[in-house]
């Protein structure tokens, strides 16, 4: 069951046998039976991020750009974009040095 604060209309959460508004601090008593109706359980999933690194096969089809490799100093690398975070965040730009093959990423 969900209960909203009568003062500010925000969600009230159970705390120490009472319902409490986290925004304005309004508290409301609950009965012993009622407290079971308002149990709060948080479920978080551990999502592991998989990142695909492009191997040397097929690199020649990727676009290139002039950027300095942090490992060898060469000034040309392949690049590609990949969504590695939430959809509402920008893509991650990956680079792979044409000379030494070092791969690094850049965030916007």
Swiss-Prot record:
On whether GTP-binding is a keyword of this UniProt record, the answer is no
- Per UniProt, the C4-type Zn-finger stretches lie at 5-24
Report whether Repressor shows up as a keyword of the record. no
Query: What Gene Ontology cellular-component terms does the record carry?
Result: DNA-directed RNA polymerase complex
Disulphide-bonded residues? none
* Keyword terms: DNA-binding, DNA-directed RNA polymerase, Metal-binding, Transcription, Transcription regulation, Zinc, Zinc-finger
Annotated residues for binding of Zn(2+) 2: 69, 72, 97, 100
Entry's Gene Ontology BP terms: DNA-templated transcription; regulation of DNA-templated transcription
PROSITE patterns cross-referenced by the UniProt entry: RNA_POL_M_15KD, ZF_TFIIS_1, ZF_TFIIS_2
Annotated residues that bind Zn(2+) 1 are located at 5, 8, 21, 24
A GO molecular function held by the record? zinc ion binding
Residue ranges annotated as zinc fingers (TFIIS-type) are 65-105
The job of this chain, per UniProt, is described as: Induces RNA cleavage activity in the RNA polymerase. In its presence, the cleavage activity of the RNA polymerase truncates the RNA back to position +15 in a stepwise manner by releasing mainly dinucleotides from the 3'-end of the nascent RNA. The truncated RNAs are able to continue elongation. Involved in transcriptional proofreading and fidelity. Misincorporation of nucleotides during elongation of transcription leads to arrested elongation complexes which are rescued by TFS-promoted removal of a dinucleotide from the 3'-end.
UniProt cross-references to NCBIfam families, sorted A to Z: TFS_arch
Family, similarity comment: Belongs to the archaeal RpoM/eukaryotic RPA12/RPB9/RPC11 RNA polymerase family.
Q: What is this protein called?
A: Transcription factor S
Q: Give the species this sequence originates from.
A: Methanocaldococcus jannaschii (strain ATCC 43067 / DSM 2661 / JAL-1 / JCM 10045 / NBRC 100440) (Methanococcus jannaschii)
């Amino acid at each position: 069951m969900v209960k909203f604060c009568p003062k500010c209309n925000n969600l009230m959460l159970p705390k120490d046998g009472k319902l409490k508004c986290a925004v304005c601090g309004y508290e409301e008593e609950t009965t012993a039976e009622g407290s079971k109706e308002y149990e709060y359980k948080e479920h978080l999933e551990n999502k592991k991020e998989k990142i695909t690194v492009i191997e040397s096969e097929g690199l020649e089809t990727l676009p290139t750009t002039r950027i300095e490799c942090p490992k060898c100093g060469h000034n040309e690398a392949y690049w590609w974009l990949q969504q590695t975070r939430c959809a509402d965040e920008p893509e991650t730009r990956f680079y792979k040095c044409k000379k030494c093959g070092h791969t690094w990423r850049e965030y916007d």
